[in-house]
Regions:
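Structural motif
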Residues: 16-19, 45-48, 74-76, 125-128, ...
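Charged C-terminal helix
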Residues: 195-219
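Short pre-catalytic strand/loop immediately N-terminal to key active-site residues, enriched for Gly-Thr
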Residues: 145-157
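Short, small-residue-enriched loops and turns at beta-alpha junctions
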Residues: 25-28, 53-57, 135, 152
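Conserved phosphate/ATP/ADP-binding segment of small-molecule kinases
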Residues: 61-142
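Short, small-residue alpha-helix embedded
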Residues: 85, 156-192
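Conserved N-terminal subdomain of the carbohydrate kinase-like
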Residues: 1-49
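Glycine/small-residue-rich loop that forms an oxyanion/phosphate-binding "nest" at active or ligand-binding sites
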Residues: 29-78
Length: 219
């Protein structure tokens, strides 16, 4: 959770991975993210980038693109609209602004995998596109993860929970070196997160609760 420019390198140096989440993006935090990314690169740590709201403003899209170029993320994790926007921008096409930052699923599984693979080829990162069914474009393999519950899409912050899990799983696999199977760590993080959602939804429904209780149960 470090955001100060003068501490991010120290904090990054005692971590096993780095998560760059653009959720509360401000101009003053960008240099800190860049510094953390540089330190992670020196240390060989996996870097997970979540381009939150990349479809909401030009500022967010450009910051995400800059992070891709400067921090060289190992994993890029976003919803379908965010991943499509980054893919378009990196291919030289302007992606327009759309309302909101929450997840939506619009294309077929094949079209979503195609977009994820396209961004993977452009960036060298493992690309994760979350939605009703999560798709992963690994270095050599593609995955579809079907764990989860519809209520999870209604919980603000569920994506941030996933980012944390992904950082933990990738940090563990990062100990195997730069050629460690990060895509497997990513898939396991997605599955674990989805299973937590399924269990939390079942527990909450049994008590007659709603999405507010699901959030607490997931934690």
């Amino acid at each position: 959770m470090a955001q100060g420019l003068h501490e991010v390198e120290d904090v990054t140096s005692i971590c096993s991975s780095l998560v760059l989440n653009l959720g509360t993006l401000e101009e003053k935090t960008i240099p800190a993210m860049e510094a953390a990314g540089r330190k992670a690169a020196v240390l060989g740590l996996p870097v997970i980038l979540d381009p939150v709201g990349a479809t909401a403003s030009r500022f967010r899209r450009q910051t995400a693109i800059d992070m891709i170029r400067k921090a060289a993320p190992s994993v890029i994790r976003g919803n379908e609209a965010e991943i499509r926007a980054l893919n378009q921008e990196l291919r030289g096409h302007e992606a327009g602004n759309t309302c909101g930052v929450d997840s939506g699923t619009f294309g077929t599984i094949e079209s979503r995998l195609e977009t994820a693979c396209s961004l993977r080829d452009l960036t060298g990162a493992v690309v994760v596109m979350t939605g009703e069914e999560d798709v992963v474009a690994g270095k050599e393999r593609r995955f579809i993860v079907r764990n989860g519950h519809p209520w999870m899409a209604r919980i603000t912050g569920s994506g941030c929970m996933l980012d944390g899990l992904m950082g933990a799983f990738c940090g563990l696999y990062g100990e195997l070196g730069p050629d460690g199977p990060l895509e497997e760590a990513v898939v396991m993080a997605l599955s674990a997160h989805g299973l937590c959602g399924e269990l939390a939804a079942g527990e909450t429904a049994g008590r007659g609760g709603g999405t507010g209780q699901v959030h607490s149960a997931c934690i």
